């Protein structure tokens, strides 16, 4: 598998490296980086041998881009990046282009779509209305589908949306069918204030069930052939969800805010939203929940003056600032256990 996925290949596409060649290429390339920090050639050689031994003994392996690109002209060794998106067509397309180049080099990408105006919102330049963040996510997904990461694997993305965005429920159900956003993990960014509101809004709810009919209506829409007809059916189900979750009593609900105008569009019962999202995650695997305030505490974001964390890498374990990259690796704990000859374990 290693030779097939990570080896350099000839013009016929056949591997020209054995596993040990891959490990030496990576070890030497990574170790030579220390020449920039005062290490001698002798020290670098020793470091390369140590790194090779870790990989050869299967105690540690770096991420795929490192295995594929180290020692080559590309030199893109990072696993994942977070790219910012602003509310303009220029920014949306520029970020899409950057995403494609990162995927081409073997990296994954994470995005927050929270700054994009909601579906149906006004576009001054054309006098029309926007399709909203979910539709742009599908465009990103389609581009991803055409590019293998480093020519090795399918691209991967994380798409996040703030829970205060007017398209929050439309976003929550976007992966109910098997064909939408197949190259995305999706997560809602929830705040401490929202979680408090979940507890407070529970008293307004007498029935914990979610509108199964609306959820099933959205799921079944994938069988409709025509794109326009399918989208109309999805919107019917989404509208039912908004009607169900809308806050109708005094003191109930939290505000959805249009990011373009900063105006309130409606109020939803936070307990119902939370209940729906957790039910969908349990039953279908998406969306996830990201506790965005926790990620911006000093222990998680040590450089708050640089910016606020709004997204993570595709798998969600690494919060990143805009244009940040993460370099991942796998430690084989079983190989690192020190066996006690006096123990039966």
What is the predicted role of each segment?
Residues 1-345:
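Extended catalytic cores of very large enzyme megasubunits
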């Amino acid at each position: 598998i290693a030779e097939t996925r990570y080896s350099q290949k000839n013009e016929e596409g056949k591997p020209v490296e054995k596993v040990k060649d891959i490990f030496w290429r990576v070890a030497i390339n990574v170790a030579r980086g220390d020449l920039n920090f005062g290490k001698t050639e002798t020290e670098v050689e020793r470091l390369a041998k140590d790194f090779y031994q870790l990989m050869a003994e299967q105690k540690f392996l770096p991420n795929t881009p490192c295995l594929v690109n180290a020692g080559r002209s590309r030199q893109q060794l990072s696993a994942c990046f977070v790219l910012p998106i602003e509310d303009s067509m220029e920014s949306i397309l520029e970020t899409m282009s950057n995403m494609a180049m990162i995927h081409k080099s073997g990296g994954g990408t994470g995005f927050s779509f929270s700054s994009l105006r909601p579906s149906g919102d006004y576009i001054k330049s054309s006098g029309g209305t926007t399709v909203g963040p979910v539709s742009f996510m599908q465009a990103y997904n389609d581009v991803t589908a055409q590019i293998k990461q480093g020519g090795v694997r399918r691209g991967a993305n994380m798409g996040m949306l703030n829970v205060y965005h007017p398209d929050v429920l439309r976003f929550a159900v976007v992966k109910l069918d098997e064909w939408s956003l197949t190259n995305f993990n999706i997560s809602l960014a929830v705040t401490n204030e929202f979680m408090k509101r979940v507890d407070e809004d529970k008293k307004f709810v007498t029935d914990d069930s979610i509108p199964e009919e609306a959820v099933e209506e959205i799921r079944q829409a994938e069988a409709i052939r025509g794109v326009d007809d399918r989208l109309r059916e999805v919107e019917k189900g989404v509208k039912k969800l908004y009607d169900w979750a809308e806050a109708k009593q005094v003191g109930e609900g939290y505000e959805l805010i249009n990011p373009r105008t900063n105006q309130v569009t409606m109020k939803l019962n936070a307990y119902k939203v939370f209940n729906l999202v957790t039910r969908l995650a349990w039953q279908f695997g998406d969306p996830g929940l990201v506790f965005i305030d926790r990620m911006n505490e000093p222990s998680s974001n040590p450089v708050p003056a640089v910016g606020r964390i709004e997204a993570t890498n595709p798998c969600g374990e690494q919060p990143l600032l805009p244009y940040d990259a993460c370099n991942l690796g796998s430690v084989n704990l079983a190989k690192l256990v020190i066996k006690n000859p006096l123990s039966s374990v």
